[in-house]
């Protein structure tokens, strides 16, 4: 028997990011009373969403189809934009390719089919949009804008959280900040009937008909990173929220939820060694260091350890981050010569760089053995090629006889001054999570729904494997958040 003195809501949503707030709004729209439990203080609300650019990948028919969603876009701007349709087949092919075909087809099909309807629904909930790469739309005639990420939330990730939170307040949804979910409660038949909540004053129970877990991954939990992703990852700096510590994973699996997906996989990237230990909205986006394809990367012994030119950085930055974290202290040094410098990302301008006219002098500055670094450089240059860099082409110029090889952009590093940048690995979010069905119901080990329990967002496993697809994360969070809210409210 439940205690009538315990607070009650029809639906409890754990988390207050994109997926969680979409779930809360969808449940409220169905007439349910809703409480949102946010572990973070109000100033840090939103999980990883505030650290994103707010981009959404969805099916559309080109710029004409998007105009109703962009009331601030002038006719003149729209007339100078070329944007091809983004079809269901495009979306399916892209997601299948980056996940090596491992993504769950049932979730993928639901994501794709519901992507545009969910964008329209979010618009009705008060979300405003901006055209992706809008600035380029006013300088060219016409401007060709990528079709795959057609829209971003107004004022990016922080703006999205602000808009969704405002809509929740207007809808009468209670948001309980600095309130942590420490466990799920069940009745005698195993139905989830609430949560154990903890704030600064007390631990107490909140009753409900349904609970939606939308509280992110476990990327900010060093112990879980080391256990599941592997040795070295406990050293990773966290690029997003410090509050995403796997609370939902642990609570759900304690009552029999089935784990699924690539638990040893995550989205990560090389970042500046001076990046903060956890996300900082002001600087996080300036920390990635992804021009490694144009030079060599060495560890603290002065030795290369990875194929820097295996592919474009957009395809390899996750594996590069993983490789760096396997090195001593999770540190690497990117080295370039003056031929490469004009091609480095602008973000390198915010780094502490080391610069010298000789490799020996550079080695002394970065604290590695000069003889070892010189031998590494000589072995590389002996097999490398003369010429200039063409960063947007896989040029095939390789050093196949050097171990490890460099498959592209193997240009001799021989024109001083030489520059070095110290980097480490940063983690954005994790891939492993809970198994759900297409109604966002959490499944047990026998693939049966756990009554009263739903999940959405990063906590869901089975969507991303090996790599992620830009702007698909926010989209799948919104799609399955909306579904979870609707389904939970109908119990």
Q: What do these predicted ranges mean?
A:
Residues 29-50:
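Glycine-rich FAD pyrophosphate-binding loop
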Residues 183, 372-467:
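A glycine-rich dinucleotide-binding beta-alpha-beta segment and adjacent secondary-structure elements
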């Amino acid at each position: 028997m439940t205690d009538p003195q315990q607070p009650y809501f029809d639906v409890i949503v754990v988390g207050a990011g994109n997926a969680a707030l979409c779930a809360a709004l969808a449940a409220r729209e169905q007439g349910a009373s809703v409480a949102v439990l946010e572990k973070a203080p109000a100033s840090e609300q939103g999980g990883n969403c505030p650290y994103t650019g707010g981009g959404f990948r969805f099916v559309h028919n080109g710029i004409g189809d998007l105009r109703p969603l962009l009331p601030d876009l002038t006719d003149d701007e729209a007339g100078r934009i070329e944007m091809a349709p983004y079809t269901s087949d495009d979306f399916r092919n892209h997601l299948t390719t980056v996940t090596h075909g491992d993504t769950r087809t049932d979730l993928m099909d639901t994501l794709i089919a519901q992507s545009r309807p969910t964008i329209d629904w979010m618009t009705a909930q008060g979300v405003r949009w901006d055209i992706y790469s809008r600035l380029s739309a006013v300088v060219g005639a016409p401007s060709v804008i990528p079709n795959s990420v057609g829209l971003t939330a107004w004022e990016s990730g922080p703006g999205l959280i602000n808009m969704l939170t405002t809509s929740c307040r207007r809808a009468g949804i209670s948001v309980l900040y600095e309130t942590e979910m420490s466990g799920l409660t069940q009745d005698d038949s195993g139905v989830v009937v609430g949560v154990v909540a903890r704030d600064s004053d007390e631990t107490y129970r909140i009753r409900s008909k349904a609970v939606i877990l939308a509280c992110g991954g476990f990327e900010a939990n060093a112990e879980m990173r080391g256990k599941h992703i592997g040795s070295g990852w406990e050293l990773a700096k966290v690029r997003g929220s410090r509050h995403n510590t796997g609370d939902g994973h642990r609570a759900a699996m304690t009552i029999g939820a089935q784990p699924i997906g690539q638990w040893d996989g995550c989205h990560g990237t090389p970042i500046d060694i001076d990046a903060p230990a956890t996300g900082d909205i002001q600087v996080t986006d300036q920390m990635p260091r992804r021009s490694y394809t144009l030079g060599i990367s060495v560890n603290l012994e002065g030795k290369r350890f990875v194929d820097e030119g295996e592919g474009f950085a957009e395809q390899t930055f996750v594996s590069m981050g993983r490789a760096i974290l396997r090195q001593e202290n999770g540190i690497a040094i990117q080295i370039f010569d003056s031929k490469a410098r004009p091609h480095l990302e602008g973000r390198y301008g915010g780094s502490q760089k080391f610069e010298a006219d000789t490799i020996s002098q550079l080695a002394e500055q970065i604290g590695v053995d000069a003889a070892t670094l010189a031998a590494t450089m000589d072995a590389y240059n002996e097999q490398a090629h003369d010429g200039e860099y063409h960063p947007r082409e896989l040029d095939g110029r390789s050093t196949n006889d050097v171990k490890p090889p460099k498959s592209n952009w193997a240009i001799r590093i021989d024109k001083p001054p030489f520059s070095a940048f110290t980097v480490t690995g940063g983690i954005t979010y994790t891939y492993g999570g809970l198994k759900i069905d297409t109604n966002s119901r959490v499944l047990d080990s026998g693939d049966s729904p756990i009554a009263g329990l739903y999940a959405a967002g990063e906590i869901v496993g089975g969507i991303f494997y090996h790599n992620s697809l830009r702007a698909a994360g926010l989209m799948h969070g919104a799609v399955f958040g909306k579904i979870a809210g609707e389904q939970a409210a109908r119990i």
